[in-house]
Amino acid sequence: MIKHRGLGVAVVLLSSFAAWIYCIATVVLGLIYQAYPGQENVAILISTLPTIVMMLAAFASSVILRVCNRKLVVVVSMAISIVAGALILLVDMPLVGVIACSALLGIPGGTIASANPTVLAIVAPLNLRDKVLGWHNSLMMLGMATFQLLGGVFGETGRFQDSYKTVLLLIPILVLVILFYPNVDKDRSLAQAAGGAQETAAASAEGGKFPMVAVGMLLLYLFGAIFWNAWFMNYSDYIVNEAQLGTTAMAGVIGSLCSVAGTVSGLVVAFWIKATKRFSMTLAFILCGVAMLLPQLTQSAAGCYAGGILCQFFNLIVVSGLTTYLGLATTGKNATTAMSLLAGIEGSGVFLCGYIVPVVGNLFGGGAGMNIMVSGIILMVIGVAAYFVIKPTHEMVYGKKNTDQQHG
């Protein structure tokens, strides 16, 4: 049973790796513009519409995952993305067809990101439960880095369609998901095998009451996402145009290193929480904010490298940490709702960042560098507020008596 449970956890994490397949378009946007000259304002939807679909799919998952089998939702989502990507690769379609198929690639980013944390919380052994949710985020980040790398390699032909050969990587993953993804909605013994019976019973006893600390964490995530995404939306413009510290090649290297840093932080977030306890998210928010100050303060390439890597590392500590706390503080249908909202809020943060951050930055002179710097300062303020949400959450999850001793 232990071996089977381990295989189930591994396959769930493998499907997490596949969630952000939509990101292929971001690395070949220039080729897309070349393929549709004079239609740039419409062609950009190939890379932006999937994020909107991802956000909508995540919010819809709060309902879908309550009434549908979670394994089926994951399988169907992956199958849709494979078919959509294959159509872009193999069929000579007009622009509207490519936009529609690209949009469908955003579905797994919403549904898988919502379903997998709730499944992991059920099937993972108790001693791994506070780790696997961080691994889930880490695998999604690793998947994004892999898809962008392969998309760029396949796109060397000059045809953006060839980048979608990357989608073929999902076929063996889908086969493994069909065979070994834990069917927690059908086989209730999986929850008991993982020690989850107690949580299930607690969920029933609570009568569906949604914990207030979960509301607080979702709000923290929303406000945080608006401002931590300022780095990703401004760093290339700052490096290439505003500060003129390097070319797009330098920006690309920094982006890749950021992905590596984010992958590492997802793997170590459980140890971070155990070491810093109720201060875990406060410190991560503040250090993420401090890192975002480095490019503007140093006006150097080294400052951009250090700022980007540290920003992404602590950003993913926050993302994985809040995911972990939320997954451990909610059970049953509340957990499904919480994770769906969390995935949707991430997309909302990206969307709102594009409108709110420039307005705030303009109050202090404007520009990409100022947008990043002001956002960093705001993240530090959010970090202070985070303490008042995480302190009771940490006590709820780890126990009041052990808050200052457990895992010390």
Where would I find each of the regions flagged by the language model?
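Paired small-residue
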Residues: 96-104, 302-310
